[in-house]
A protein has these predicted regions:
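Short, intrinsically disordered terminal segments enriched in charged and Pro/Gly residues
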Residues: 1-17, 93-128
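Short recognition patches in nucleic-acid-associated and regulatory proteins
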Residues: 1-13, 27, 31-68, 91-93, ...
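Short loop/beta submotifs within extracellular cysteine-rich repeat domains
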Residues: 34, 82-87
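Extracellular structured ligand-interaction cores
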Residues: 72-76, 83-85
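Flanking scaffold residues of small Cys/His-coordinated metal-binding clusters
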Residues: 19-21, 71-74
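Short cysteine-rich clusters marking metal-coordination/redox-active sites
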Residues: 25-30, 79-82
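Phosphate-end processing signature that detects enzymes handling 5′-triphosphorylated RNA
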Residues: 77-78, 110
């Protein structure tokens, strides 16, 4: 692991948190996505998909097992640097993008400083 990655923890498969700089980072290309005190999705590329493209009708007619775009939308969230798909959301039309990950950065930094937690191989662990 490079020295610049030492202060990062892996949050999801494709998303890292740089604790010292308080930035969201793409795990694949290292691109800064945005401030860690905000929703990381604000710095990503969003693709609002028609659910019928993803789940094509299985049978003809009104009841065809395909999601109705009047009831659901599919939003794909991509890294603006490398295009890796970070997340997918199924939302009601008009519903804002969810803010699903939020850390208490001040508390986390304090606990790291005190030695209660350590970062090993991009994982946050309790100190021994």
């Amino acid at each position: 692991m490079s020295a610049e990655q030492e202060g990062r923890i892996r949050v999801t498969e494709y998303l890292n948190l740089d604790i010292e700089r308080e930035r969201w980072m793409c795990n694949r290309c290292g691109r800064e996505i945005g401030p860690a005190r905000e929703n990381y999705k604000k710095g990503c590329l969003l693709y609002d998909r028609d659910p019928r493209e993803i789940h094509p009708p299985l049978v003809s007619g009104e009841f065809n097992f395909s999601p109705d775009p009047l009831w659901v939308r599919i939003v794909e969230i991509y890294c603006p640097g490398c295009g890796t798909q970070i997340e997918t959301e199924y939302l009601p039309p008009g519903h804002p993008i969810t803010h699903d990950i939020e850390f208490d950065l001040d508390n986390l930094k304090e606990r790291l400083r005190k030695g209660e937690f350590v970062i090993r191989a991009q994982r946050l662990e309790a100190a021994e």
